[in-house]
């Protein structure tokens, strides 16, 4: 099975995309070629002797060279040449014709697979003296590394002898041909390279594949004595029967299968010398090969040629490398043009300077700077200029803008025009292909590190033997002796070889004699915010410059560099685990620098994901995780996953058909077609999400509504190019941790989640994995059909697991649909397997009803917990997943602690609530309402919510940690605030209330304690339903629900029937809060609406300016009286308060709710003159007046709790989880209303227990409380991705 898996993996590696999308493994040493083999062999036999296409020789020699060679060798006439060219043209057409994909019989002479692909017959070209061979000569590198830089790159590609470059290198065809070759300069060679025909484009595209097979030099064996190679000199001129399956026309399998070093173009006789022939014979002995290396790659010929160039972007690695190398070749050509223009520009500069030397002597310094810059740019290598050009252009443009209009500014503009020829091309590369370049490198590195001692075929290396590592030159080195990257040496060492063995091999290697001191590739510049680039002229122009063989060589060498840059997957995971205790200033666990490590831990599945796939993986992981949140049985979840996979595959197929029918580049699909998919896709999955009365809890709002998609689209400055369409921050606002959240409301009704997630702009990377998706769905269905108790079920599940692993190993992309869903299916099958084993041991176990009891204390909860959270204990979030660091604040019956997720290192604020208190104080509905609101609201001025879960005694709400404290703590430290600062804070509260009211939510407990300050200094509302106001502690005395907390607009409130005795009790309990901020209608219980929040805004505005609330008094009864009688101690106007502030506060504190400011909506509040200087559209993006400056990520010094801590807080945690309160003294600041909080707290606890024991129902269930907010967890992925490129991680100390 291991051997079989290697074949599957090798198939996955292959960048081929044969027409039938076959990914099935091929047996070792198989002699039967596939379709494209048949196609090529037949086309070769039908088209007579394959005369090479003249454009194909553009890589290393001119078209006239071939014609001259043919004339001098055979004396053929022009007519014959014309006929040959017509034949060659027909060969090129047949290669591009989709109709030739079938009906081609295999050649009978292929015996050894791709390693023994025979060369094209020299006699068929009329060049009988050319020596050809099928294996590379690693020893030649000793002689050829010192070649002149102008040496042909075609030979360095390792073409078997059928390449005209090789033929010319070994040809002794007369002085005329050699003169032409010797006379070709570096520039001439490069120009010729750029003149290749479109027909060459296809050949080069095939040769660019990084995964097209093991290097031919792995076993540079010659065929047996009966092979054609040894009889090449006497072979017939036609060569019809001798064309191998991999040789049709100019397309030769060896072109990309043999990365061979260069021949001597300038000295063709060397290849015919006795020493050369001796070396050839010495290196021709057969060598043992690895079984996994025997694989036919002939099917990859013409696999892309049937498509026109604009359809190149199915994002398979070989296609990507083709385009990347094309861009690099164009960049080099553009650089040469820039050099030429800069020379002319410098001459003009000197002329202008001479004319104006006397009249404008002050220009001399500027002219000199321009001359120096022009010379520096001209002397810079293309590789260095690739990195530097953007910065140069930016600096030059900055200097230009500082100049007054005139000659100097015109000269700067002219130079900018010259240089931007390169920067425009670079920008196109970054916008369109920057991410794919990293995908190719990352995928290759992962593949290479997963197979031991299998040399990577796409890395551009040549393993003649284990002891002969070699260094390849990039295209620029071969042409111009240029270097692409600083201080990087690529050595051909097997990825898993130990360093000491490698050192020995390296010292023994003769190729080490000529090792380059630095191996420099075309680097990938730092990526910026990108938009979905439209198809550019380079893509749509049918005359686009084709990629050349030399460029493909350089692209494969790029992949080799990636091996050194990326650690194996295991090592990467271990490396990341070392940093899990570190925290960045975004307060998400520190990740290694993304540009170096190229992976982060997904916050949904907590698996390592390549950064280039984070976007797609987050969407896939959201879908895969959805049904684990519902407490469904194992079989139900397996069927749900299978249905999701079927829908994904169907969506992809539908998009592909639309793209083929209507899109010129196969990628652009209109939104109208995407929305039409909802009529095609099955609705059963969305039906599952709406069972029973838990629509609000289990409807998966983060995937079911467009807000989740808006979040994915709205994240700015993404370092990886996204496929959600153009990036824009219009309508978006910045919140903490540099996240972006929309202002859009929660849409109803909710569409199908899969249609929303997959129906967005763009597509996943892994559309080519559709067959594997279907296979995964079939496996999941089969596993779900396994009958518990059947003797054959357990072996059947084991076979399902084996098949599942095979399918996963055949995936083409890591961390996307196949791997993510495959992992979930594997987990579910294993879970079912364990249950079946338990059934065999204990017949009393019921598989369909066995779940983990989350609440445990009551027997009824066992039944209710069927719908709780995932069955598997690893998937159920609990307090054990968090490390409690320190307390933050205390509320009426809840505590807030700073905690760290153990697996990721992310910091969170966990609100801990006692179930007994919730029940005793009649606040169960309130806490459930708070959780539901936090799940659904998404606004930059509302705190973000991530998890909710329970244990035996407590409820837990996990929210983002905001280190800036709250406005109450700020007031305690500063006394009062400047009116300008207050204006901004209140404006942000207005925006938050506008959003909440539009969603039908009334906060009802606004006060400075509930206005938190985020990392960026902006305000965030919290505490939806769990108020710290003292009245809520007396709800056990009320006939109705709590008078304080969050409600919906249409919720009717009970009247407040408070007696004098109850008011006295409130006095005693004043330690837990006061009713300062409550509106009169709430105090009176006469019914209230959204205007109650505007009353609270007026109170807060007054307190921020003055320092104390307007109705403050020693006892709650006096506060109550002040509120009802509107006794406000107004400060002096305008000395202590502006007239505008006085007016808006007065209108906010209007007793009649219908006359109160805000009764007609937030619009009239925003139009008040007090906010005349506020820009509401950009408020969230403006810099705050106060930005927290914490000493560390776990610094909680900004929080000053209104309430004291006591020993009863230890009851909030299971044994062993009691936090250390040694540093809680800084938070135990009490309000002025209390005398002895500790005693009163103890009295309250005692009283509470007494009340709990007398009449409170004890069977209340919190089984529906658990929730995992997938969309917010996905937003952490984007926070990490966007911040990882620009923020240095900060390390936090461990809390002892």
UniProtKB/Swiss-Prot annotation:
GO function terms (MF aspect): ATP binding; kinase activity; protein serine kinase activity; protein serine/threonine kinase activity; zinc ion binding
SMART domains named among the record's database cross-references: S_TKc
ZnF start-end (C2H2-type): 602-621
Origin superkingdom: Eukaryota
GO cellular component: root hair
Active site: 1005
Compositional bias ranges of the Basic and acidic residues kind: 68-77, 101-112, 178-208, 1236-1245
Record's function text: May be involved in root hair elongation.
Protein name, as recorded: Probable serine/threonine protein kinase IREH1
Gene expressing this chain: IREH1
